[in-house]
Amino acid sequence: MKKFMALAVAALMLVTCLAGCGGSKDNANNTAFKIGGTGPLTGDASIYGNAAKNGAMIAAEEINAEGGIQLEVRYEDDVHDPEKAVNAYNTLKDWGMQLSLGSVTSKPAEATSASNFEDRIFALTPSASAVAVTSGKDNVYQMCFMDPNQGTASAQYIAKKGLGTKIAVIWQNDDVYSKGIHDTFVAKAPELNLEVVSDTTFTKDSATDFSVQLADAQNKGAELVFLPMYYRPASLIFAQAKAANYAPKWFGVDGMDGILTMKGFDTSLAEGVMLLTPFNADATDERTKSFVTKYKERFGDVPNQFAADAYDCVYAYAQALKAANATPDMSAEDLCSKMIEQFTTMTFNGLTGTNMTWNKDGQVSKDPKGMVIQNGAYVGLD
């Protein structure tokens, strides 16, 4: 009986060991690095998620065609919802994800980045810009500007270009992306002799009627209205401002990129809207022209900065993997250590910036580009 029990315990230990080593056993047969991301592929924010997915796919195809390292990229739909994002992340983890593109939008990314940190799966998000995405997580990095940096940079740009001194701000107070940009903008404005004469808010549930906010801005003589928000509420603001015969200067942020391809939107309403973005689809360098041409041919749209940032994420991974002499049979945890070492020391040139670097907190250093919408297209201001 004792002998039988000993054999049973030994067998159980063997099964447990094999189960615990399953990740590395699966990776042993990998011929490509598995890179996963979540984003809104359906729903109101789907322009962002599909753009990121499309940009990442083009980059992976180009890198694979070179015949060196091979990449397999997979995206799961999170519908811009934190709970669904975690479920999507777990699906990717079960698939064998070794490296992550995080989540496309900030609130879901706050949830999935916690899982990235706990699981030691390195993440490089193209566009989730909230501070909480990377804060306290040594293995979560951003290709995009952080929200506070966008707020500060927007205030500096408005002041430097003399776009107006009396400013109204309309922002969404239950959205971390909007709040983060708003808070640093209004903090920086007084230093630059910008007077915030109107500071009004809305929520996700009230994002249909902006008459009160627009009336407040107009009555207080705002020359420029700053809109730190995504494109959908902005599209309603532009339409309602026109109906109210209010025509200030408009200044947005990178979340507004995508408004020109929004279904049913009259692009003439966005004429003259200015924003800061890291990517200009009309740039004349060969790499940008090639990317834009491929994107148009494949997907029928002009790529926005979400597509370009995701494209850059995949190329940054390729550069880091080559420099680290990494191989697809490595565990996610081993790759995580190598990526931290590479990203804190390397310099990267991409579509969205040159000589990009990252600090130990995962924040990227690159310069934004001023853009204005003219005749239904983005045109460089600088």
Question: Can you name each region flagged by the protein language model?
Answer:
Residues 24-32, 48-54, 65-134, 143, ...:
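Beta-alpha junction/loop-to-helix N-cap segments that form part of ligand/metal-binding clefts
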Residues 238-311, 372-374, 378-380:
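Extracellular/periplasmic periplasmic-binding protein-like sensory domains
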Residues 140-201, 224, 317:
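An alpha-beta-alpha
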Residues 85, 143-166, 179-181, 207-211, ...:
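Hydrophobic alpha-helical segments within soluble ligand-binding/sensing domains
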Residues 297-304, 318-378:
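Segments of small-molecule ligand-sensing domains
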Residues 184-276:
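Extracellular/periplasmic bilobed ligand-binding domains
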Residues 1-34, 65-68, 382:
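Short, low-complexity disordered leader/linker segments with a strong preference
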